[in-house]
C-alpha cells in the first residue's frame, strides 16, 4: 500500500487529485496544473515534498567521507549552511542519485535525496560510511515543504518570528540554516526564488494552514515537473540513472576534477569517458503545433553529413513559453537544428542549451 505524507488529508481537503508516485500518494494537481504552474512563476506556490529523504551525517571524518562518496567536492563548503548539488556515482560512473548536501558543522552534514531512490541510496551511503565511522541518521521525523515563486520569501517571512527573520535575512541561494524548529534553505526545483523548509512532522499541518492563510496556494507534481523542465533541471530516472554518466546529463559542472589526487567513487570511469567523449544533454524547442514527449527519437546530421539519432528524456508543453520544449540526450556533433519523429510526421526543432526559463523570463527566444 502506498505511503502517505503527514499532509495527505490537507491535499484531499484542497481538492487534490492523488496519484501513486514511487510508492507515495501525492497530489498531481488541485484542479489545474497550468494555473498552479503560472502561480509559481508569477506569485507563490507550495509543494509537499515530504516524500524526499533527509539524511544527517555525524562524525569527525564526515567531510573526508563525502569527498570520497560524491563527485562534487565538499571541500568547497567552508561557510556553515552552504550547500552544493552533486551526483553520487557508482564505480562505472553511472548516477546512483543526484542530491543536495549541506555543511552545518565540521562533524555534521545533511543530505537530501530523492524518494524513488531512497532504499538504494541509504544502503550505499551506509555501506561506504562504515570505514569512516560516520553515523547515518534518517530524519523520518521531519516533513518538507517547498515554497517557490517571486513572492514566496516575502509570504513565508510573515509566518516567522523576529529571530527567524533575522537568521535568514540576506541568505544567498544554496544555503540552509536551523532557526527554531525550522530548517530553512534557499533551494528549489522550479527556477524561482523560494525556500525549502524542513520541520517536525507534528507541526507541518499547522504550518501548511498558515501558508494557505498567507495566500500561498498548493501546487502538485504536474506543475513541479513542467516548472523544473522549463528551468532545465534533471529528473532522476529520465535525464540520468545508474547507466548514464553525469557527463551525458549536463552534470559535468558538478564533477570536481581538482584536486587531481582526490579519489571519489566513479572517478576513474569518468576520466575514461571524458577522454573518449560522451553523449550530451540538449534542449529542444518546437514552435509548431504538437507536443514533444518522452522517448521520442531525435534525428540530426553532423557537419560531415552523417545522420545520428538521440532520444527525448523529458518533454512537455511549456505553459510559460506557450510552445513545446524538451530535454534530449544526443550524440556529440548536433548543430542548431534537428527533427523529432512524432507518429508519422517529422517535426523540425531548434536545439538550445538545456534551460528555457529563469526567474519567470524566457532565456531561449
Swiss-Prot record:
Subunit (UniProt): The glycine cleavage system is composed of four proteins: P, T, L and H.
Domain of life, per lineage: Bacteria
Family indicated by similarity: Belongs to the GcvT family.
Protein name per its UniProtKB record: Aminomethyltransferase
A GO term, aspect molecular function: aminomethyltransferase activity
Origin species: Yersinia pseudotuberculosis serotype O:1b (strain IP 31758)
Function comment: The glycine cleavage system catalyzes the degradation of glycine.
Gene: gcvT
A Pfam family that the UniProt record links to this protein: GCV_T_C
Keywords: Aminotransferase, Transferase
Catalysed conversion reaction: N(6)-[(R)-S(8)-aminomethyldihydrolipoyl]-L-lysyl-[protein] + (6S)-5,6,7,8-tetrahydrofolate = N(6)-[(R)-dihydrolipoyl]-L-lysyl-[protein] + (6R)-5,10-methylene-5,6,7,8-tetrahydrofolate + NH4(+)
A cellular component term, taken from the record's GO annotations: cytosol
Disulfide pattern: none
